[in-house]
UniProtKB/Swiss-Prot annotation:
It comes from the Archaea. CDP binds at G69, M70, N71, E72, G73, A74, L169, D170, I171, R172. CDD domains: HTH_ARSR. The gene is ribK. Transmembrane segments: none annotated. Keywords: Flavoprotein, FMN, Kinase, Magnesium, Metal-binding, Nucleotide-binding, Transferase. Binds 1 Mg(2+) ion per subunit. SUPFAM superfamilies: Riboflavin kinase-like (SSF82114), Winged helix' DNA-binding domain (SSF46785). It catalyses: riboflavin + CTP = CDP + FMN + H(+). It is an enzyme of class 2 (transferase). One of its GO terms (biological process) is riboflavin biosynthetic process. Its cofactor is Mg(2+). This is Riboflavin kinase. Belongs to the archaeal riboflavin kinase family.
Amino acid sequence: MGISQQAASQHLRELEDEGLITRNAEGKGISVMVTDKGRHELLRVYNILHDSLHSRPDHVEITGTLVSGMNEGAYYMSREGYTGQFQERLGYVPFPGTLNVDTDRKHGPEIARLDGMNGTIIDGFTDGKRSYGWVKCFAGTLNGTIPCHLIRLERTHHGSSTVELISKLDIRKETGLDDGGKITIRIPLEQED
């Protein structure tokens, strides 16, 4: 690689300190694993390079399958610390609950692209008993007709391939979709603040 062993060790230590990799001693060497945070950072850099070298699309399109969640979305979406911000920043208070969508693994770069975008931030807050994380919202449409926001959360129990949607509408009722239903989410890459 053209650098000394000490310089390589220092770089690895910095990456580990930032939570981008983990290192484990194995025999006479070490094993290096990229963390989820590191994978997201790699995808973010990939998207920047890709957009610099290729024509940039004007939207991200994500397909997936509707799945049941843990019924926590209704609780969180109805917290007073969030509802006022939703009304102020998105123009509506979401229908209680989130729509959970398992995306195909091939959409990892698109999801990482969203993670690297600004979106509309709903600030985290504390209610005296516990703290609640931030929510990053991206305006879009579901199946070409239903206005919604894809949300990325500071704290979530879902894996990286699951995204959540909110809307002022009861999406399940409006679409007649049940678990297992296929959906398409379209998110413009230029988001208005």
